Amino acid sequence: MVRLRIVILVYFVASLVLGAQKLDNLKCMFLGYPELEYDGFDRTEVLTEKNFNKTVFSEDSKSVVFFNDVEEDDPELDQYECFMQLSAQIMTKRGYTFFTVNTTKEVKLRKQEGVDKGEDTIHVYKDGFKIEYNGVRDPETFVSWMMDIPDDPVTIINDEHDLEEFEDLEDDTVRVIGYFEPGSAALKEYEEAAEDFMGEIEFFAVVTSKWARKVGLKRIGEIQMLRPFEEDPIYAPSSADTEEEIEDWVEKHREPVMQKLTLENYFNVWKDPEDDERMILAFVDEETREGRAMKKLLDKIADENSEHAGTLEIVLIDPDEFPLMVDVWEEMFGIDIEEGPQIGLVDISEKEGIWFDISQINLDDPKKHSDSNFEVLQTWIDQIMSGSITLEDDDDDDEPEPTTPPTPVKGKKGKKEL
């Protein structure tokens, strides 16, 4: 087993004293960090439609806004407060201001900021940019993510350190990189397009031929997108040179075939797919021999199925990175994750799945059986994409066959069914 990442567990008691400068009745304990204590001070302010824009979009402001519909009598209130207040305790020292918006009361503001009804969302507003946090509600993960927020929407590659940063993200996130003349209008358009994707897609640029060659760009104005686990880049059309055109191109191609579930992207990935998408979960422990063989096979599957991007979504999950969730997932889908790799077509909200028979592939000698393993798994993928394998079949099997209602007796009025 790999060294498990320390997880902060938040325990809470008592109730919140609203409007107090110090929340004396809010007790938070963080296991794993004995010296870490919440000092009891309320560092959050309430925002409304009247003061929102002038507050979060003011010059040089760094605002963290918690959009929520948690009510005073909600049992989750104290847990939510502990997460929010400890994060504020740490990050206010670094220039951030923390706010809350009650989405039940501020409906117009909720819609303005693109927050769905009943959804708890966290937005960071920094230097005029809005960045949405999609990670788990854990102070350690959230604070770490905030500290890594870049100062600029585009990283200019000027040295080996920048190049290493670009290369290290290979299988972690979607990357976009372009070659521009320094200070050009085209670079400005590219930077403005990148603003709308901060926190979701990493944008890079090169402004010299030396670094352009190192990242595989040949001509000024060339833009590439590199998606996780796919070898070949996607090229933007040469006509895409304005902010709007670049945004449209990125939006069209941004969905990778396979992406890894992490603490930072959890709620952006662990959600029901769109109606025309198929979601496949792949539980793979990369510390085991079978897990490494399965991961290598899935890498090839993702690369060979790039034409299905946007309609096929493979979510790669390393159980070692989510030890507290293994039992939950096993019970949810009726599988044994610790037994070995598991891969299945799933419906998250319905908590059901159709699971591939792993015995059909040979993971003990993957080199010898590389071609046959790929063929078998690809055939299964093809059946899913063609509709031969579908979760809807299971739903249909459970439904009783419709019966023909009896013909009403002539001369009598049938009763209306309510």
Please give the residue ranges for each predicted region:
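N-terminal leader/targeting and pre-domain segments
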Residues: 2-69, 86-174, 180-183, 197-209, ...
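Residue-level detector of functional hotspots within protein domains
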Residues: 30, 38, 189, 300, ...
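Short pre-active-site segment immediately N-terminal to redox-active cysteine/selenocysteine motifs
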Residues: 60, 68-73, 284-287
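Typically the conserved alpha-helix immediately C-terminal to a functionally engaged Cys/Sec
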Residues: 71-93, 99, 105-106, 183-199, ...
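A short acidic, amphipathic alpha-helical/loop segment
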Residues: 109-112, 189-193, 214, 297, ...
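Eukaryotic modular interaction domains in large regulatory/scaffold proteins
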Residues: 272-327, 333-339, 344, 350
